[in-house]
């Protein structure tokens, strides 16, 4: 626990914490227990069943760290999770000027466009725990099954790190697979590599770890 996490406003705040307490990727191993303490959740912990980045049941385009460094979620997604994930994820994104702990900034996104709904919309849609809404995957709104209040990308980060929750993992991987429909729409309507064609869809693909450079 580090109370400075709750007061992060600048990149300098982030780098100070990373220098003091950040953990390198190589220090995370199967069997570790990860303690979660951030602005949205305190007191949650999970175990790493496998080593980070191994034994994946699907083939994402990029790792979470690569996605942050390339530009995702307006630079605003995990900035209070510095002590949960590898320090390299944040250092690399900071060096590339891709994080915005103050206000979200669309210009840091890979395609320079906004491509997501606000968290309040996710709650109303039943995509995150605590909403009570029963959508296509009612398990997602059940906090006993889904501990990831920030949605799919948070699940992906924890899955990549080595956490395994079979029921939740199956649902989130199926959602990832279903997102390929956007790739089909881009291929049907855009010339190959024309990044100015459907940039929002491309950014959305990227934020679900699919190839946006179709």
Regions found by a protein language model. Name each.
Residues 4-147, 151, 163, 181-200:
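Compositionally biased, intrinsically disordered low-complexity regions enriched for acidic
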Residues 167-177:
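EF-hand and EF-hand-like helix-loop-helix modules
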Residues 156-164:
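Eukaryotic basic, amphipathic alpha-helical target segments in cytosolic regions
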Residues 152-155, 176-177:
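Tryptophan-centered motif/residue detector
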């Amino acid at each position: 626990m580090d109370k400075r996490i709750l007061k992060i406003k600048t990149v300098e705040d982030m780098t100070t914490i990373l220098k003091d307490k950040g953990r390198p990727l190589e220090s995370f191993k199967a069997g570790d227990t990860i303690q979660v303490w951030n602005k949205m959740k305190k007191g949650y912990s999970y175990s790493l069943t496998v080593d980070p980045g191994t034994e994946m049941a699907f083939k994402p385009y990029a790792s979470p760290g690569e996605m942050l460094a390339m530009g995702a979620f307006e630079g605003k997604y995990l900035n209070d999770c510095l002590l949960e994930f590898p320090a390299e994820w944040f250092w690399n994104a900071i060096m590339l000027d891709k994080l915005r702990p103050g206000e979200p900034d669309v210009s840091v996104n890979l395609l320079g466009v906004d491509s997501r709904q606000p968290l309040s919309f996710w709650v109303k849609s039943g995509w995150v725990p605590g909403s009570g809404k029963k959508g296509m995957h009612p398990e997602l709104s059940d906090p006993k099954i889904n501990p990831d209040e920030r949605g799919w990308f948070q699940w992906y980060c924890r899955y990549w790190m080595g956490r395994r929750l079979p029921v939740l993992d199956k649902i989130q991987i199926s959602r990832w697979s279903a997102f390929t429909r956007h790739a089909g729409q881009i291929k049907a309507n855009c010339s190959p590599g024309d990044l100015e064609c459907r940039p929002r869809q491309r950014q959305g693909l990227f934020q679900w770890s699919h190839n946006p450079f179709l």
